[in-house]
UniProtKB/Swiss-Prot annotation:
Any one Gene Ontology cellular component term annotated for this protein: plasma membrane
Protein's name according to its UniProt entry: Ribonuclease Y
Documented EC number(s): 3.1.-.-
Residue stretches making up the HD domain: 343-436
Region of interest (Disordered), ranges: 83-117
Species this chain originates from: Dehalococcoides mccartyi (strain ATCC BAA-2266 / KCTC 15142 / 195) (Dehalococcoides ethenogenes (strain 195))
Role of this protein: Endoribonuclease that initiates mRNA decay.
Family the entry assigns: Belongs to the RNase Y family.
């Protein structure tokens, strides 16, 4: 057929016959059709194959799932059995525990029942005993009332009188017992305290060697002759008035041969007047202008001497780093005395003693020395400022010292404050050692006699005292008491009361011994 088309078909411009072209076209179409059919068949084959593979996989997965499900089911059954067994065991254990608790509760209930029964029995017994006791007490009260009536009839005393007598007797016995025990404790405590104090003081004294100082400020200036008295007085007394006005002292020119007495309460003024008067006597030129010049120069020399004395005293006391104001004020104490004892030398001794006592007690030695050295600084200005020298000194030290320990030592060394620290006790002990040793201090005859009379008046003011005597220069008081009014224990109380009144009402150096003497004499005659 193709050949027919090829033979009969006309030719084209390309030279190929139309039939050839149609043959090629039909061949191409047929190839496409057969290729599509082949492709469809092949694709169907492939799809069938994949389908079979998928079916096999699905079958396998289904089988595996069944196996796995079976395993899971078996495991679940096993876990369920295990949980059931555990629950059954726990339930069994709880039932057993509940049974035990029930048994215990029953036992406790039985025990409580028994106790309740016992309590009821005891209550009944106590009720019976209470009735018996009430009956017995009633009988005793009746017997007591009867006996009291009989005693009142026999003793001719009422009940209140008997009670009063018994209380008085008991009070006397208790007072005697209390006094006896107080005496025993007092002896014991004093012995222990004295032993410890002796140890500390002896250690301090062994390490300190100080001079005995009893000097006083010079009040009398010697004159080369009595003619100098007239020159000192001057025409119409102008020289002596100028000298008294420039120095602030009183010059006493009396019948005492070749001597002029300087009188003033201010030791510094007294020293300035002494030096100025000595220079005027040596120079010989005595007139108001010269007096003013010499007095001004004497003031400068005394101030320089005070500073030098203060520095020297601080060096001897082992106290360093003091401010110039303190040095100058301490130098004034060179011209200040207390009961005849030079206060500056006393301050040096107290500083040394305080340091040694502080070292024995284990405190700061430097601060102890400093407090001891400054403890009497208030005496340098106590004539110009109101207050005790401890208050004045504490106020002055607060301005220049930062250490509270030093301030406490100055303020508390006379126990003027409500509380006393260890620094106050250290300085007080050192002050007592320096001032109370023999020869350290002395007092005027007038003050001495007043103190003796005051001691005897204090002792005589107590009931039962017959006579008192102040002896040993006022360091001991002996009291004679009436034996019918004061017994032995009362004598102890009397001594303690007198000591307390002396401590509260008198100022004195050192310590005063109080001795109470009770004498009983029994006299009879043989016939």
């Amino acid at each position: 057929m193709l050949e027919f088309f090829m033979e009969t078909a006309p030719t084209t411009t390309t030279g190929l016959p139309l039939s050839a072209i149609l043959a090629i076209f039909f061949s191409f179409i047929i190839g496409i059709v057969f290729g599509g059919m082949a492709l469809f068949v092949f694709r169907g084959f492939i799809m069938n194959r994949q389908l079979r593979i998928a079916q096999r996989k699905a079958t396998k997965m289904l089988a595996d799932s069944k196996v796995e499900a079976k395993d899971v089911l078996v495991e679940a059954k096993r876990e369920a059995d295990k949980a059931r067994n555990s629950a059954e065991a726990e339930l069994k254990e709880r039932r057993s525990e509940l049974a035990k608790q029930e048994n215990r509760v029953m036992q406790k209930t039985e025990a409580l029942d028994r106790k309740l029964e016992n309590l009821e029995q005891r209550e009944q017994s106590l009720t019976n005993r209470e009735k018996s006791i009430d009956e017995t007490q009633s009988q005793i009260e009746e017997i007591r009332t009867a006996e009291l009536k009989r005693l009142e009839e026999v003793a001719s005393m009422t009940t209140e009188q008997a009670k009063s007598s018994l209380l008085e007797m008991l009070e006397g016995e208790m007072q005697q017992e209390t006094s006896r025990r107080l005496r025993e404790w007092e002896i014991k405590i004093k012995a222990e305290a004295d032993e410890k104090a002796r140890e500390i003081v002896s250690q301090a004294i062994q390490r300190c060697a100080s001079d005995v100082v009893t000097e006083t400020t010079t009040n009398v200036v010697p004159l080369p002759s009595d003619e100098m008295k007239g020159r000192l007085i001057g025409r119409e007394g102008r020289n002596i008035r100028a000298l008294e006005q420039a120095t602030g002292v009183d010059l006493i020119i009396d019948d005492t041969p070749e001597a002029v007495t300087i009188s003033s309460f201010d030791p510094v003024r007294r020293e300035i007047a002494r030096q100025a008067l000595s220079k005027l006597i040596i120079d010989g030129r005595i007139h108001p202008a010269r007096i003013e010049e010499v007095v001004a120069k004497a003031k400068e020399e005394v101030e320089a001497a005070m500073i030098a004395s203060g520095e020297q005293a601080a060096y001897q006391a082992g106290v360093h780093g003091l401010r110039p104001e303190i040095i100058k004020v301490m130098g004034r104490l060179k011209y200040r005395t207390s009961y005849g004892q030079n206060v500056l030398q006393h301050s040096i001794e107290v500083a040394q003693m305080s340091g040694m006592i502080g070292s024995e007690l284990g405190v700061n030695v430097t601060l102890a020395r400093r407090a001891g050295f400054l403890h009497d600084i208030g005496k340098a200005v106590d004539r110009d400022v109101e207050g005790t020298h401890t208050q004045i000194g504490a106020d002055m030290v607060k301005q220049w010292e930062k250490s509270p320990e030093v301030i406490k030592g100055v303020a508390e060394h006379h126990f003027d404050t409500p509380t006393v620290s260890i620094w106050g006790f250290i300085v007080s002990a050192a002050d007592a050692i320096s001032s109370a040793r023999p020869g350290a201090r002395r007092e005027s005859l007038e003050n001495y006699i007043k103190r003796l009379k005051a001691l005897e008046e204090i002792a005589d003011s107590f009931k039962g005292v017959e006579k008192s005597f102040a002896i040993q220069a006022g360091r001991e008081v002996r009291i004679m008491v009436k034996p019918e009014e004061i017994d032995d224990l009362g004598a102890m109380r009397l001594a303690r009361d007198i000591v307390k009144k002396i401590e509260d009402g008198l100022e004195y150096p050192g310590q005063i011994k109080v001795t109470v003497i009770r004498e009983t004499r029994s006299v009879d005659f043989a016939k």
